[in-house]
């Protein structure tokens, strides 16, 4: 084996020379230079400085402006809440551990950090599934004149949390486990060892199939149907130009969120799957560290996309920041993507 396995860790470094120490007890500077750990800490500090204000602002602006409290926005706000969980439960912990060069909070802290990171990522993925289904139901009308209302949005939010917990909670109760990964300063699911005591392999397969592949299949199916329906409706001019424009805007926004999610999480998922299928092979700590830390940017990009592509929310945000005045002079009451859940676009 090209790594060293302990009772609650796996270090991707052979202990033939006797230098390997538990990532819960001693700095891991034999894995990487101290300055590299400092770079990780600086990166986490940047994500905290960006992730907390922009997600908190998303929640605050919505509370301040009643017009933003639409069913579709409930799902988008759910993403902001999940991102804040990642910032407080994961990023702050990883910042501190990176400064020390090892996971100073012990196995319990590792469980909490891994749980919050997994929970946030899964809430984001299942929120995108709910958004994709909402777009499919609203635009393609498979259920006649069904309207996506507040109760449906609340059920959608509850669904995302149930599914996310179904992925993040089992390692806390004995099905798989959370262990330090990469440079041993952040924690994630154990892809590295079979660890028969916790039936680790069965959980990893379950997670990849149920909590990654199936959601992506649903998302791609919904948007494939949606693109076809919108083109057909536009060709037959079934809707007004204003309605079609609004539907295209909200659909474009959600599709960009999906693309951003894939850019952030596919490298991590790909590396994790490779490690899982090549357990014991030779790979360095950087191999998992880079995609793991890159995936954490997901806590920043969703609100940025939302703010950039939603004119009404952007205007409300500017009004809030400028103490009730909007220097841009845009009309907040204009038709926007956040109010398109009552769309009447129908299939051909």
From Swiss-Prot:
The modification N6-(retinylidene)lysine is found at residue 296. It holds the Pfam family Rhodopsin_N. It is a multi-pass membrane protein. This is Rhodopsin. Belongs to the G-protein coupled receptor 1 family. Opsin subfamily. The record marks 113 as: Plays an important role in the conformation switch to the active conformation. GO terms for biological process: absorption of visible light; cellular response to light stimulus; detection of temperature stimulus involved in thermoception; G protein-coupled opsin signaling pathway; G protein-coupled receptor signaling pathway; gene expression; microtubule cytoskeleton organization; photoreceptor cell maintenance. Phosphorylated on some or all of the serine and threonine residues present in the C-terminal region. Contains one covalently linked retinal chromophore. Upon light absorption, the covalently bound 11-cis-retinal is converted to all-trans-retinal. After hydrolysis of the Schiff base and release of the covalently bound all-trans-retinal, active rhodopsin is regenerated by binding of a fresh molecule of 11-cis-retinal. Glycans are attached at residues 2, 15. Keywords: Acetylation, Cell projection, Chromophore, Disulfide bond, G-protein coupled receptor, Glycoprotein, Lipoprotein, Membrane, Metal-binding, Palmitate, Phosphoprotein, Photoreceptor protein, Receptor, Retinal protein, Sensory transduction, Transducer, Transmembrane, Transmembrane helix, Vision, Zinc. InterPro entries: GPCR_opsins (IPR050125), GPCR_Rhodpsn (IPR000276), GPCR_Rhodpsn_7TM (IPR017452), Opsin (IPR001760), Retinal_BS (IPR027430), Rhodopsin (IPR000732), Rhodopsin_N (IPR019477). Homodimer. May form a complex composed of RHO, GRK1 and RCVRN in a Ca(2+)-dependent manner; RCVRN prevents the interaction between GRK1 and RHO. Interacts with GRK1. Interacts (phosphorylated form) with SAG. Interacts with GNAT1. Interacts with GNAT3. SAG and G-proteins compete for a common binding site. Interacts with PRCD; the interaction promotes PRCD stability. Forms a complex with ASAP1 and ARF4. Forms a complex with ASAP1, RAB11A, Rabin8/RAB3IP, ARF4 and RAB11FIP3; the complex regulates Golgi-to-cilia rhodopsin/RHO transport in photoreceptors. The chain crosses the membrane at residues 37-61, 74-96, 111-133, 153-173, 203-224, 253-274, 287-308. The modification Phosphothreonine is found at residues 335-336, 340, 342. Its main location: membrane. Expressed in rod-shaped photoreceptor cells in the retina that mediate vision in dim light (at protein level). Disulfide bonds join 110-187. Changing residue 94 to I: Stabilizes the activated conformation and hinders hydrolysis of the covalent bond that retains all-trans-retinol. Zn(2+) binds at residues 201, 279. Residues 330-348 are annotated as: Interaction with SAG. Photoreceptor required for image-forming vision at low light intensity. Required for photoreceptor cell viability after birth. Light-induced isomerization of 11-cis to all-trans retinal triggers a conformational change that activates signaling via G-proteins. Subsequent receptor phosphorylation mediates displacement of the bound G-protein alpha subunit by the arrestin SAG and terminates signaling. The modification N-acetylmethionine is found at residue 1. GO terms for molecular function: 11-cis retinal binding; arrestin family protein binding; G protein-coupled photoreceptor activity; G-protein alpha-subunit binding; guanyl-nucleotide exchange factor activity; identical protein binding; opsin binding; zinc ion binding.
């Amino acid at each position: 084996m090209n790594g060293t396995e302990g009772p609650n860790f796996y270090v991707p470094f052979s202990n033939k020379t006797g230098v390997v120490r538990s990532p819960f007890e001693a700095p891991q500077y034999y894995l990487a230079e101290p300055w590299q750990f400092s770079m990780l800490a600086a990166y986490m500090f940047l994500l905290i400085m960006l992730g907390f204000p922009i997600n908190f602002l998303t929640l605050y602006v919505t509370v301040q402006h009643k017009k933003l409290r639409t069913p579709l926005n409930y799902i988008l706000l759910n993403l902001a809440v999940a991102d804040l969980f990642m910032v407080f439960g994961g990023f702050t912990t990883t910042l501190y551990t990176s400064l020390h060069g090892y996971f100073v909070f012990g196995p319990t802290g590792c469980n909490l950090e891994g749980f919050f990171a997994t929970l946030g990522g899964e809430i984001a993925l299942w929120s995108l599934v709910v958004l994709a289904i909402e777009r499919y139901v609203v635009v393609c009308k498979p259920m006649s004149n069904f309207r996506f209302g507040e109760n449906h949005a609340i059920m959608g939010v509850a669904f995302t949390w149930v599914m996310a917990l179904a992925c993040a909670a089992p390692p806390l109760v004995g099905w798989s486990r959370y262990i330090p990964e990469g440079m041993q300063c952040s924690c994630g699911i154990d892809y590295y060892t079979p660890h028969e005591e916790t039936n680790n392999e069965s959980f990893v397969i379950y997670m990849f199939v149920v909590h990654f592949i199936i959601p992506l299949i649903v998302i791609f199916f919904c948007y494939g149907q949606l693109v076809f329906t919108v083109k057909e409706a536009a060709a037959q001019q079934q809707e007004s130009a204003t309605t079609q424009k609004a539907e295209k805007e909200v659909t474009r926004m959600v599709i960009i969120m999906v693309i951003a999610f894939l850019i952030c999480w596919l490298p991590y998922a790909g590396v994790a799957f490779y490690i899982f299928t090549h357990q014991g092979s030779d790979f360095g700590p950087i191999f998992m560290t880079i995609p793991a830390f890159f995936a954490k940017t997901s806590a920043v990009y969703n609100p940025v996309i939302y703010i950039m592509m939603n004119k009404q929310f952007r205007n409300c945000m500017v009004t809030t920041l400028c103490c009730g005045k909007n220097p841009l002079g845009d009309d907040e009451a204009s038709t926007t993507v956040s109010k398109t859940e009552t769309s009447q676009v129908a299939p051909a």
